[in-house]
Regions:
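Active-site rim beta-loop-alpha module in soluble metabolic enzymes
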Residues: 103, 113-114, 122
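A short, N-terminal amphipathic alpha-helix
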Residues: 2-18
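Conserved alpha/beta core of the MobA/IspD/sugar-nucleotide pyrophosphorylase nucleotidyltransferase superfamily
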Residues: 133, 137-187
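Short beta-strand/loop segment that forms part of the nucleotide-sugar
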Residues: 18-27
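Conserved donor-nucleotide/metal-binding helix-loop-beta segment in metal-dependent transferases, i.e.
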Residues: 80-105
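Short phosphate-binding loop-to-helix
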Residues: 33-69, 128-131
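Short aromatic-hydrophobic micro-motifs that form the base-stacking/packing surface
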Residues: 71-73
């Protein structure tokens, strides 16, 4: 299932023509596998630490290369569409903006940045129902504007996966279940 999520996320990112794609991967020993699966994307090791440390490292690497904006997204939001990435890019045209894609569980499935903000990710209660709320407080404290995308369901638990498998056909027709995953479910 994780491979299908990765395939779909990579395919989605490639649909956004104005984007270079970087793949944050772990563990280090999986570099060759990720290079083969995500041909055409640049690999960046996530390194060690909690999610905040890894997001800080990944965004820092991208901004150090001279990029003026970065979108970091997980591979566990199978209903995310290209229109959401395009909305994120439009919102990031405004300076000092942080774009967040809220998840139903209180976290977020995507974050877009206009600059490297290590303080944004420090001491956040990751994987909790307070992750988004605490991140929004931090955005405000740093003097940035938050742009919230439409809320989505991500797949973090067996219950989330069951919900997805039970309900994927009943979703809003403007949302599309990712290609590789939907083909697998139909089998």
């Amino acid at each position: 299932m994780a491979r299908l999520f990765l395939d779909d996320s990579f395919t989605l990112a490639k649909k956004v023509a104005e984007a270079d794609i970087f793949i944050g991967f772990a563990p280090e020993s999986a570099a060759d596998w990720f290079a083969a699966v995500c041909a055409g994307g640049e690999l960046i090791s996530q390194g060690e630490g909690d999610l905040g440390a890894r997001l800080t490292r990944l965004s820092g690497e991208v901004f150090a290369l001279g990029y003026e904006k970065a979108i970091l997204m997980g591979t566990d939001a199978p209903f995310l569409g290209a229109n959401r990435l395009k909305e994120t890019l439009r919102a990031l045209k405004a300076p000092q903006t942080v774009v967040l894609g809220p998840a139903f569980d209180g976290g977020y499935y995507l974050i877009g940045l206009t600059e490297h903000l290590p303080e944004l990710f420090d001491a956040i209660p990751w994987s909790s129902d307070k992750t988004l709320a605490e991140t929004l407080k931090r955005v405000d404290k740093l003097g940035f504007k938050a742009h919230l995308l439409e809320i989505e369901r991500d797949v973090d638990t067996p219950e989330d996966l069951k919900w997805m498998l039970d309900n994927w056909r009943q979703l809003d027709p403007n949302k599309s279940l990712s290609y590789h995953l939907s083909k697998s479910i139909q089998k």
